[in-house]
């Protein structure tokens, strides 16, 4: 498995936009999570974001909150999630990025947490409730063990804050396309295009756009606006949760392929 930075560099060399699907670990069960990681990798995912179920997911919309609630109801813990990553990571090409709130990191201690996730094969972290002002306590030790901590840019952020986040973010920059929580939207606001332009003037780091992207045409639109990656969460989680686990897997495999095909289309 390659690092997050190496993956983006390879894609840039080939002038390709990365597809980053998101799923919630443990929904509907851990066995299906392992199968889903393998399937997404085989269906065109360039990186995969794996959500750790959490009881108070402030950044997540109803679809991902419900998935986390179901997983927690089955007793899924961080150690279980990392067990799946350890099993699957040697078999797939796509780097796994763990999406986790800060409390599990704080509870275990930064150093112990990083050693634990590194040993499992995690290549990156997204911590949505980690403020920029406190990020250094995680960024520096994570960098030392080879884990990229990607920071989020909100659409309401002033340019000075955008520039500060761009300087510190590792691997890529996560541009949140909408104010509020994750979830499916009917369209992607043109504000994203403006934000991509502002960010691009501040950094040459890869920029991924997430929150609200739910259709192949959204993915193509954001790519054509200049994004280096498209992150698809709620629409993926919703498909995986519908029907039997086998039906859910079939649905996300087909959806992932459709998204990948859209990203290959010319403007």
From Swiss-Prot:
Catalytic residues of the enzyme: 49 (proton acceptor), 60 (proton acceptor)
Record InterPro entries: Aldolase_TIM, RibuloseP-bd_barrel, Trp_synthase_alpha_AS, Trp_synthase_suA
Entry GO MF terms: tryptophan synthase activity
EC number(s) reported in the record: 4.2.1.20
Classification via PROSITE patterns: TRP_SYNTHASE_ALPHA (PS00167)
Signal peptide limits: none
One GO cellular component, as annotated: cytosol
Family annotation (Gene3D superfamilies): Aldolase class I
CDD domains tied to this protein: Tryptophan_synthase_alpha (cd04724)
Catalyzed chemical reaction(s): (1S,2R)-1-C-(indol-3-yl)glycerol 3-phosphate + L-serine = D-glyceraldehyde 3-phosphate + L-tryptophan + H2O
rRNA-binding among keywords: no
Record keywords, A-Z: Amino-acid biosynthesis, Aromatic amino acid biosynthesis, Lyase, Tryptophan biosynthesis
Domain of life the protein comes from: Bacteria
SUPFAM superfamilies xrefs: Ribulose-phoshate binding barrel
A UniProt-annotated Pfam family: Trp_syntA
Pathway entry: Amino-acid biosynthesis; L-tryptophan biosynthesis; L-tryptophan from chorismate: step 5/5
Family under the similarity heading: Belongs to the TrpA family.
Subunit structure: Tetramer of two alpha and two beta chains.
NCBIfam families: trpA
Function: The alpha subunit is responsible for the aldol cleavage of indoleglycerol phosphate to indole and glyceraldehyde 3-phosphate.
Family annotation (PANTHER family): TRYPTOPHAN SYNTHASE ALPHA CHAIN, CHLOROPLASTIC, TRYPTOPHAN SYNTHASE, ALPHA CHAIN
Protein name, UniProt field: Tryptophan synthase alpha chain
Organism the protein comes from: Rippkaea orientalis (strain PCC 8801 / RF-1) (Cyanothece sp. (strain PCC 8801))
């Amino acid at each position: 498995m390659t690092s997050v930075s190496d993956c983006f560099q390879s894609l840039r060399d080939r002038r390709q936009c990365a597809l980053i699907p998101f799923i919630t670990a443990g929904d509907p069960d851990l066995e299906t999570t392992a199968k889903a990681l393998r399937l997404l990798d085989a269906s065109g995912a360039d990186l995969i974001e794996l959500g750790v179920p959490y009881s108070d997911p402030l950044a997540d919309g109803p679809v991902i909150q419900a998935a986390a609630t179901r997983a927690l109801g089955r007793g899924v813990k961080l150690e279980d999630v990392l067990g799946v990553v350890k099993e699957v990571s040697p078999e797939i090409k796509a780097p796994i990025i763990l999406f986790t709130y800060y409390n599990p990191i704080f509870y275990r201690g930064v150093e112990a947490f990083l050693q634990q996730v590194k040993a499992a094969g995690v290549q990156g972290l997204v911590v949505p409730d980690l403020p920029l002002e406190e990020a250094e306590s995680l960024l520096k030790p994570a960098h030392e063990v080879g884990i990229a901590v990607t920071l989020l840019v909100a659409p309401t952020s002033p340019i000075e804050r955008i520039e500060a986040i761009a300087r510190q973010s590792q691997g890529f920059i996560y541009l949140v396309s909408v104010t509020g929580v994750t979830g499916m939207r009917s369209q992607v606001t043109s504000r994203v295009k403006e934000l991509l332009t502002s960010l691009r003037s501040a950094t040459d780091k890869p920029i991924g756009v997430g929150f609200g992207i739910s259709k192949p045409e959204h993915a193509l639109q954001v790519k054509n606006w200049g994004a280096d990656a498209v992150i698809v969460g709620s629409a993926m989680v919703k498909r995986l949760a519908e029907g039997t686990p086998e039906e859910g897997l079939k649905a996300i495999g087909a959806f992932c392929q459709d998204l990948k095909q859209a990203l290959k289309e010319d403007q």
